[in-house]
Amino acid sequence: AVGAATLRIAPSHVVTRDSTDALAIANAHAAHALHFIWRHYRKPIRIDDIAGSVSITRRRLQTLFLQELGRTMQEEITRVRTAHACRLLSRTALKINIVAQQAGFSTSLHLHRTFQNLLKTGPKAFREGGFPIPDLGVLPASAENAGA
């Protein structure tokens, strides 16, 4: 009707769907590599393992991945592991060495060095300081439960 007022209704909650995990990646090899990382980040992953799962050369996959995502595969592995460690530190009382293990870090020292480098604080201080979980970019909910 002419002159009618607009009524805006705020959303009451957000529903996460499978499509929430979707990233627009044009190259199938890079997309496969990304999903391989998301599924296996808790295990020791070598770039050669990822390339082998895609059946192209390591060098070619590294180039495609960097072009598509703007970061290297190793940076993605570290990003996903760090995000998971942040969630564990924020939501559980697990010991730091267990957090490191469950997030895919080889040792608690590796976890500590990664936190210092990326977040400018250690895991213990992160937990005790009540820091918000940092925005480390897109991280699908499916990665949180991967490799369990």
Could you say what each language-model-derived stretch is?
Residues 48, 67-106, 129-148:
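Terminal helix-turn-helix DNA-binding modules in bacterial transcription factors
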Residues 61, 85, 111:
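Short hydrophobic/aromatic patches on the structural cores and recognition surfaces of FHA
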Residues 33-37, 65, 69, 73, ...:
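Short hydrophobic clusters on alpha-helical segments that form packing/core surfaces
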Residues 22-29, 35, 109-148:
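…primarily DNA-binding HTH/wHTH and HhH modules…
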Residues 1-22:
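Flexible loop/turn connectors
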Residues 26-76, 92-103:
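DNA-binding recognition helix and immediately preceding turn/loop
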